[in-house]
């Protein structure tokens, strides 16, 4: 069975994510959601009021994937929540949160991608950016979209 895909959006609506997926050729998006292979959620509700809510959700999905004989979970998560109120305290909270995420999971077969809006990422100091890519994590900087509709 296919992996469970989790898309946690912050700046886009759930409907716009469905539309974008359809526009780039993903067929039958709603049926993929209905069969449990795709979850699209608002990331705010997964971080607030419990900052570890996203971790708990991914762990639950990972266990479900194991029980269903799936290959695992891929989580694509917009980290915009951590920039919502601004200030250095939130950057520290973000860095601590990212540091708590293992680059490789043992037994869960989870692949995670933390996504940052360029405007948010540029507000971080150089040393904060370096801290985010510590412990075997990698940074992919996508600066331009070539998707046209």
Model regions and ranges:
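Non-catalytic regulatory/interaction regions at protein termini and inter-domain linkers
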Residues: 1-149
């Amino acid at each position: 069975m296919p992996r469970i895909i989790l898309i946690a959006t912050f700046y886009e609506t759930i409907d716009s994510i469905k539309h974008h997926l359809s526009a780039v050729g993903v067929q039958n998006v709603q049926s993929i959601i209905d069969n449990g292979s795709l979850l699209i959620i608002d990331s705010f509700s997964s971080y607030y009021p419990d900052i570890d809510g996203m971790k708990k959700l991914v762990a639950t999905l990972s266990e479900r994937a194991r029980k269903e004989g799936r290959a695992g979970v891929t989580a694509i998560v917009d980290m915009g929540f951590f920039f919502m109120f601004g200030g250095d305290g939130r950057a520290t909270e973000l860095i601590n949160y990212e540091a708590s995420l293992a680059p490789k999971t043992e037994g869960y077969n989870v692949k995670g991608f933390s996504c940052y809006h360029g405007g948010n990422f540029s507000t971080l100091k150089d040393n904060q950016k370096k801290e985010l890519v510590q412990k075997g994590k990698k940074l992919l900087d996508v600066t331009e979209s070539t998707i046209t509709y």
